[in-house]
Design a protein with these regions (language model features):
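Structured helix-beta-strand junction loops
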Residues: 49, 101-102, 135
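Metal-dependent phosphoesterase signature
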Residues: 58-94
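Short, acidic loop-to-helix structural element flanking the phosphoryl-transfer center
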Residues: 3, 80-107, 113, 117
Length: 149
């Protein structure tokens, strides 16, 4: 059967609620560098933003680019251990499962390919998607629309 169109969804906060997963992973990573992170602060000011934009203020305002990357790399290591606290959007999963035979499916995220794939694998839906677009696949991350174009 020929597919009729494309459905593109965001991963974090749309397909899967990953706020707690990311907050805990960043909290642990930052803690190992001597910094603290509160869940409410993360949810209000960091969630959905690219890590380079929000880690600098959390790391004293002027950390080296290398230290920012070290924190992010450590966060990616903690991510898998925290996936059990993620919650899938049950209604959206039902819709996508019903439409996948007739539509191409894409998931778009500002997250890393590693974390996106781990999360989709955790919910047994990686193979649903014809395209997984991550931060490494675009020049301009969300909120720029590049990933959707």
């Amino acid at each position: 059967m020929k597919k009729q169109g494309l459905i593109a969804v965001d991963l974090d906060g749309t397909l899967i609620d990953t706020v707690a997963v990311n907050a805990e992973s960043y909290r642990r990573a930052l803690e190992s560098f001597g910094f603290t992170l509160d869940y409410d602060y993360y949810a209000a000011y960091c969630n959905g933003r690219h890590y380079r934009a929000f880690l600098q203020p959390l790391m004293g305002g002027n950390p080296s680019a290398e230290d920012v990357e070290r924190v992010h790399d450590l966060k990616k290591q903690y991510y898998a251990a925290n996936m059990d606290i993620a919650r899938k959007n049950e209604a959206l999963f039902v819709i996508l499962e019903a439409l996948r035979p007739t539509h191409y499916l894409a998931v778009i995220t500002t997250g890393s390919r590693q974390n996106a794939t781990e999360m989709l694998d955790h919910f047994h839906c990686t193979d649903w998607f014809d395209l997984i677009l991550t931060q490494g696949d675009v020049v301009n991350n969300k909120p720029d629309p590049e990933g959707y174009l």
